[in-house]
Amino acid sequence: MVAHRARRRKRASATQLYQTCKQSGTCPEDVINKIEHKTWADKILQWGSLFTFFGGLGIGTGSGTGGRTGYIPLGTRPSTVVDVTPARPPIVVESVGPTDPSIVTLVEESSVIESGASFPNFTGTAGFEVTSSSTTTPAVLDITPTSTSVHVSSTTYTNPTFVDPPVIEVPQTGEVSGNILISTPTSGVHSYEEIPMQTFAVQGTGNEPISSTPIPGLRRIAAPRLYKKAFQQVKVTDPAFLHKPETLINVDNPIFQNADTTLTFSPSGVAPDPDFLDIVALHRPAFTTRRGGVRFSRLGTKATMRTRSGKQIGARVHYYYDVSPITQTEEIEMQPLLSTDNTFDGLYDIYANIDDEAPVSSRFSIATPSRLPTNTVPLSFSGSTSNVTIPFGTSWDVPIYSGPDVVLPTGPPTWPYAPQSPFDTTHDVVIQGSTFALWPVYFLKRRRRKRIPYFLADGGVAA
């Protein structure tokens, strides 16, 4: 027979022991220190709190309030305070007419006087009348006034929603940004007409920039990348691909479509051209130059597979048609203008007279074109010999004089000192002008302690 063990009784806690043994004075020291917070840990916290302050966060106080903000339950958000903007009365904007002044004064006019609320003015009564009498006559006081007096009390309240009509206050407006809008409520009939603003007539080509700083230069448009590995390359030889590509695809219900835009088709089973089988879209065409030719290209999308969800899957095909090749520029070989068979014997002076040499003195003699003889000079070549006639009278004849070839013009001795005309143009150097202006600064210019006079002529020198 198995004996049942007695249940283990729970030991009393330190709080229960302290409540029973404190009065009798039999409590252990560790129980008293734990309950009365006199352990070493409690003493360290008490001593450290004398030098630290956490600003009312509730740390170490044991209050359990969680500081000023309190505790926030887990899984919730703190409450937010929504700022409600007070409603403001709408601002009445009055239109400005052509008769209104263009200058707006920001100082209040002195003629505008605030009169306040109107109230009636009452004049005071004559008061009481005192009747004096003799000693025998008793004093009679007339307490009834001659006219009925009325006591009127006036109280003024400020109501922001009501403005007295005789008082018009011009609002003061202060603006720093440069845009001033002054609105003043007015009453009465306006004497002007509201005319809508219109755009001024401007002249231009229509290509003017719309921004203040246009982008310099032109942006290059990216060419279509048609030769990637993701595209299947198919060459088309049928010319109908240029203007009527729909004839290469079997369409159930063909309709008119522009060939320069993207063409869409319904998938069909059989196509006239096997390269266009299962084509559902042909994108807009593009002309490119590649490998020395003009190429017409279109991108096509096929619908080879169809999933249960209705999505179509297919390859992308690049159809191209070579329109015409670009011919290379022909290189024309330059031909020599003269034959290279003839060779010269050497340097030959065509102006020399080989028949007889003239003396040196006769070369510098004065002669006219009529006096010059016309000689025939033979040219010697290895292949053949021919005579060439060269006239010697086509050049200018310049006479030669002894001394410097400078001729000064002569003029009358009286004013004005003007040179005579016509001038003698037979000389090499002719000085035009008869007056001279000498600059005083250059009379005596010091240079290396030498006095050298400089004289400049105010005239023109013509050669």
Swiss-Prot record:
GO molecular function ontology, one term from the record: DNA binding
Location in or out of the cell: Virion; Host nucleus; Host early endosome; Host Golgi apparatus
InterPro entries named among the record's database cross-references: Late_L2 (IPR000784)
GO CC terms: host cell; host cell endosome; host cell Golgi apparatus; host cell nucleus; viral capsid
Span(s) of short sequence motif Nuclear localization signal: 1-12, 444-452
Disulfide bridge partners, by residue number: C21-C27
Pfam families in UniProt: Late_protein_L2
Post-translational modification note: Highly phosphorylated.
Membership in a protein family: Belongs to the papillomaviridae L2 protein family.
Name of protein: Minor capsid protein L2
Assembly mode: Interacts with major capsid protein L1. Interacts with E2; this interaction inhibits E2 transcriptional activity but not the DNA replication function E2. Interacts with host GADD45GIP1. Interacts with host HSPA8; this interaction is required for L2 nuclear translocation. Interacts with host importins KPNB2 and KPNB3. Forms a complex with importin alpha2-beta1 heterodimers via interaction with the importin alpha2 adapter. Interacts with host DYNLT1; this interaction is essential for virus intracellular transport during entry.
Function: Minor protein of the capsid that localizes along the inner surface of the virion, within the central cavities beneath the L1 pentamers. Plays a role in capsid stabilization through interaction with the major capsid protein L1. Once the virion enters the host cell, L2 escorts the genomic DNA into the nucleus by promoting escape from the endosomal compartments and traffic through the host Golgi network.
Keywords: Capsid protein, Cytoplasmic inwards viral transport, Disulfide bond, DNA-binding, Host endosome, Host Golgi apparatus, Host nucleus, Host-virus interaction, Late protein, Microtubular inwards viral transport, Phosphoprotein, Viral penetration into host nucleus, Virion, Virus entry into host cell
GO BP terms in the entry: microtubule-dependent intracellular transport of viral material towards nucleus; symbiont entry into host cell; viral penetration into host nucleus
Organism: Human papillomavirus type 53
